[in-house]
Amino acid sequence: MDVDSGDGPVVNLLWTGGWDSTFRLLQLILDTRATIQPVYVIDTERLSSLIEMQTMDRIKRGVVERFPRAEGRILPHRFFSIHDIAEDATITESYLRLARRWHLGSQYDWLPRLAKQHGLGALEMSVVADSRPRGGIVQCL
């Protein structure tokens, strides 16, 4: 399979090296002409952060080795610290309103704040079909 050059849109992808976000990365590389801007939030409280960063590096090298034309389509990672994400009362109020109705992880508060703070516009996040959030909440995100 050959990979097209990236003359399509830039997609901001929250990529952790997990299988769900890696699937989306590969889907964008193989099925579209998009350029991927990987985004990763460093949380020093999470012990898996270093492993995830090493995994993403290995995956990216493997993709480029297998599909050399993909190299220019995966931009260098943008890394952000969770501790540097600015507060935003409007976003947090919306999150709390939704969290009263559905069980939501705190990332649904700080990810939109990150996107707004850094002008990321749309920020794609992969969610495994059998994990939360479910049902009506997906339409609210």
What kind of feature is each model-predicted range?
Residues 1-141:
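ATP-dependent adenylation/nucleotidyltransferase module used to activate substrates
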